[in-house]
A protein has these predicted regions:
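Short, extreme N-terminal segment that most often corresponds to the first beta-strand
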Residues: 1-32
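Short N-terminal secondary-structure initiator segments
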Residues: 1-6, 41-44, 94
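Generic alpha-helix signal with a bias toward terminal, lower-confidence helices
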Residues: 18-20, 40, 92
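A common structural junction motif
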Residues: 24-35, 81-88
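Short, glycine- and small/hydrophobic-rich beta-strand elements in well-ordered beta-sheets
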Residues: 30-46
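Charged interaction segments
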Residues: 43-131
Length: 131
C-alpha cells in the first residue's frame, strides 16, 4: 500500500524536536480514524560521517493513501504552514511505495497557500494513476 508522508525537511532538529513531535502527535491523534502514524526516527551515525555531519532525522507522519482526500491535503497544508511559522522549518510531502521507493512531491513552508494543496493533490493523483 502506498503511503503519504510529511516530514520536516532537514536533520538539524534538536532545538525544535519537542514542538514538532507535540504538533504531529496532536495531528495523528486527530487523524486516528485514517490510520495516521507519528514518525520520529533519527538514523544512527555511520563511520563515513564527518564529526559535524548530522544523521538523517525523520519527524512527521505517515498516512495510508486509501485514506487521503482533498480535505485532508488542505488540512495538512494549513498545518505545515502554521508549524513552519513557529519552527522556521520547511516540510516535504511525498509518497512511498510498498517496494521502499519514495518520491518527494512538494516542499511546504510558512508561505504555503491553498494552491499548494491543489498542486499536491494533482501530483498525488498523477503519481498514483501513472500519469
Amino acid at each position: 500500500m502506498h503511503t503519504l508522508y510529511c516530514y520536516v525537511d532537514g536533520s538539524d532538529n534538536q532545538t525544535v524536536e519537542p514542538v514538532l513531535v507535540d504538533a504531529f502527535r496532536a495531528l495523528v491523534s486527530d487523524w486516528a480514524q485514517y490510520r495516521a502514524v507519528l514518525v520520529n526516527h533519527q538514523h544512527e551515525r555511520t563511520p563515513d560521517m564527518a564529526p559535524d555531519d548530522l544523521s538523517d532525522w525523520f519527524i512527521g507522519l505517515n498516512l495510508p493513501l486509501p485514506h487521503v482526500s482533498r480535505s485532508l491535503i488542505d488540512q495538512l497544508v494549513l498545518f505545515t504552514k502554521a508549524l513552519a511559522g513557529v519552527t522556521a522549518r520547511d516540510f516535504v510531502v511525498g509518497i512511498s511505495s510498498p517496494s521502499g521507493g519514495s518520491e518527494d512531491l512538494v516542499f511546504l513552508n510558512a508561505n504555503a497557500d491553498a494552491s499548494e494543496g491543489s498542486r499536491l493533490y494533482t501530483k498525488l493523483e498523477a503519481t498514483l494513476h501513472g500519469a
